[in-house]
């Protein structure tokens, strides 16, 4: 083994042999030039990323008081964060529905497009509330999003019934948020909810109620062609308009 090392060392140039092994790590580049000694103060500390994150100054901008906050009650701020979570949950449920109906053994593609559109709308609702939170000087506190209660949505009628119940729950939460804003004397939040949410929720509930009624009249889910015809004609025309 020693003889092999001596043999190889004869073929290594003096410049390469003088190199020292280098360890890889996340560190800032050193300001160094040949013939100039290294300054220990220039060497970046090698710390794990988690330790670096935990050592941030807690008095930074995120933890400081807002300069724009006015007439914005902490209860309203917390309720908006809960509403954001509910809107994202609704988007999650609709996303599950959308990709269930695009499965090869279901193949109701207009149901899929309809629920995908609903999912994107719910995400937009959540983002709009996030923008409001920042505008009012609140702090966004995201929470875990609960998974949908089922993965197999059985039929178009069952999915529409679940969507109707979901929209009613979202609407009830918005009504409670509006009542809270009114109780705390926050006309801006009341106007925001009335302008962008409450009227749209009523329209969505009416639309889903109509879809459930028409599917039942057509004999879904027992009649084999009912959901196919509803998918092709009713939802197909709606998706073209959207």
Swiss-Prot record:
Tissue distribution of the protein: Detected in testis and erythroleukemia. Expression is very low or not detectable in brain, colon, heart, kidney, liver, lung, muscle, placental, spleen and small intestine.
EC identifiers of the protein: 1.16.3.1
Broad EC category: oxidoreductase
Presequence extent in this chain: 1-49
Pfam families: Ferritin (PF00210)
UniProt biased composition (Low complexity): 47-58
InterPro entries: Ferritin, Ferritin-like, Ferritin-like_diiron, Ferritin-like_SF, Ferritin_CS, Ferritin_DPS_dom
Primary localization class, coarse: mitochondrion
Keywords (A to Z) from UniProt: Iron, Iron storage, Metal-binding, Mitochondrion, Oxidoreductase, Transit peptide
Binding-site residues for Fe cation 1, renumbered to this chain: 87, 122, 125
Binding site for Fe cation 2: 122, 167, 201
Domain Ferritin-like diiron: start-end pairs: 70-219
Gene Ontology terms describing biological process: intracellular iron ion homeostasis; iron ion transport; protein maturation
Reaction(s) this enzyme catalyzes, per UniProt: 4 Fe(2+) + O2 + 4 H(+) = 4 Fe(3+) + 2 H2O
Compartments it resides in: Mitochondrion
A single GO molecular function term of this UniProt record: ferric iron binding
Family membership: Belongs to the ferritin family.
Complex and partners: Homooligomer of 24 subunits. The functional molecule is roughly spherical and contains a central cavity into which the polymeric mineral iron core is deposited.
Function: Catalyzes the oxidation of ferrous iron(II) to ferric iron(III) and stores iron in a soluble, non-toxic, readily available form. Important for iron homeostasis. Iron is taken up in the ferrous form and deposited as ferric hydroxides after oxidation.
Record protein name field: Ferritin, mitochondrial
Name of the coding gene: FTMT
């Amino acid at each position: 083994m020693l003889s092999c090392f001596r043999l190889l060392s004869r073929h290594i140039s003096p410049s390469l042999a003088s190199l020292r092994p280098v360890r890889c790590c996340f560190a800032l580049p050193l300001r160094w030039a040949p013939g100039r000694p290294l300054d220990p103060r220039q060497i970046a500390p090698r710390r794990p990323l988690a330790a670096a994150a935990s050592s941030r100054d807690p008095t930074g901008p995120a933890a400081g008081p807002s300069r724009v906050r006015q007439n914005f009650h902490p209860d309203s701020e917390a309720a908006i964060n809960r509403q954001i979570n509910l809107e994202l949950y609704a988007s999650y449920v609709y996303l599950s529905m959308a990709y269930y109906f695009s499965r090869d053994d279901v193949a109701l593609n207009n149901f899929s497009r309809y629920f995908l559109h609903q999912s994107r709308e719910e995400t937009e609702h959540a983002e709009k509330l996030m923008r409001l939170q920042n505008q009012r000087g609140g702090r966004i506190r995201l929470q875990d999003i609960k998974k949908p209660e089922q993965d197999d949505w059985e039929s178009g009628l069952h999915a529409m019934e679940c969507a109707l119940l979901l929209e009613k729950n979202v609407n009830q939460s918005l009504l409670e948020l509006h009542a809270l804003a009114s109780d705390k004397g926050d006309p801006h939040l009341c106007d925001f909810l009335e302008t962008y949410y409450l009227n749209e929720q009523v329209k969505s509930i009416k639309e889903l109620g109509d879809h459930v009624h028409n599917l039942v009249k057509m004999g879904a889910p027992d009649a084999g062609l009912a959901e196919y015809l509803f998918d092709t004609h009713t939802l197909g025309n709606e998706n073209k308009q959207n």
